[in-house]
Amino acid sequence: MGLRDSEALKPLAVLIAGPTASGKSALALDLAERTDGVIINADSMQVYGDLRILTARPSPEEEMRVPHRLYGHVDGAADYSVARWIADAAAAMATARAEGRLPIVIGGTGLYFRALTRGLAPIPEIPEEVRQRVRRMAEDEVTVVLHARLATRDPEAAVRLQPQDRQRILRALEVFEATGQPLSQWQRATHRPVLEEASAVRFVLEVERETLRGRIDRRFETMMEAGALAEVERLAARELPADRTILKAHGAPALTRYLRGEMSRADAIAEGQNDTRRYAKRQVTWFRHQMPDWMRGTPDTALDQLTGTLRL
């Protein structure tokens, strides 16, 4: 049954979060087929057109089963901010609902879900020349020195950020250099959310830790068999600037080093698996602390829980 079959157009969306390799895509496909839904991506790597296999984007066959939005629509050379994703997701949800379909937002990027349901600070776009100036300044600096520099400009952000969190430290420095205001000050002026939490069904897919580790390892091996290495080779041939987000996709740095002859294939695979497992652990921690009131379930129970909540 689709949304056209009922005037009770609640919920406005279904949100499905979960760690990598937990089975989110399969769950979303099953739910979308039952609800005449549209799957909307909330994964910060799957927005890029490069590395379809390595980032575990849905296959072309899966995308033919139900409509998919915000997958592979951004070139790897481009910057893609949370603000841009919010704008794209809001448009995709509005289009789905205008068509009488249920928006099903699925992914593992916690910041996307938080911004969607709690609002986003109105930080201006950072000019490219400012970004490059900050990056050049940081090239020869260790991260703890950058963290100390941030403490003189934005003490509140420095307290909140780990001294080794180089990417977020650089982001905070860029905001200060571009706007003259601390990032923490911008964040206090958060806009109203695009989607109120109470208007959505919110679900976290959970998998037992050892089971998830095994799934991650097997999936990485399957990706290698499916052509992930060739994808990385094509991406490397583009010679993108080193700070492009897509170059940090889990497994890409290790496979790039293998292609350069700097490590063995077996070591590259092991490092890619380890990197992905560490990321999954961070995701699980995020979902536990940032989404305490979301529904939870396993791959065995999730579909029944969601369809029961939606009264299908």
From Swiss-Prot:
Known catalytic reactions: adenosine(37) in tRNA + dimethylallyl diphosphate = N(6)-dimethylallyladenosine(37) in tRNA + diphosphate
GO biological process: tRNA modification
UniProt keyword ATP-binding present: yes
Pfam families, sorted: IPPT
Keywords linked to the UniProt accession: ATP-binding, Magnesium, Nucleotide-binding, Transferase, tRNA processing
Annotated GO MF terms: ATP binding; tRNA dimethylallyltransferase activity
Positions bound to ATP: G18, P19, T20, A21, S22, G23, K24, S25
Needed cofactors: Mg(2+)
Coiled coil: none
Positions of the UniProt region annotated as Interaction with substrate tRNA: 43-46, 167-171
EC identifiers of the protein: 2.5.1.75
Amino-acid positions noted as binding substrate in the UniProt annotation, renumbered to this chain: T20, A21, S22, G23, K24, S25
Entry keyword Acetylation: no
Site feature Interaction with substrate tRNA, where: T109, R131
Cross-referenced InterPro entries: Dimethylallyltransferase, IPT, P-loop_NTPase
General function of this protein: Catalyzes the transfer of a dimethylallyl group onto the adenine at position 37 in tRNAs that read codons beginning with uridine, leading to the formation of N6-(dimethylallyl)adenosine (i(6)A).
Membership in a protein family: Belongs to the IPP transferase family.
Quaternary state and interactors: Monomer.
Protein name (Swiss-Prot/TrEMBL): tRNA dimethylallyltransferase
Originating gene: miaA
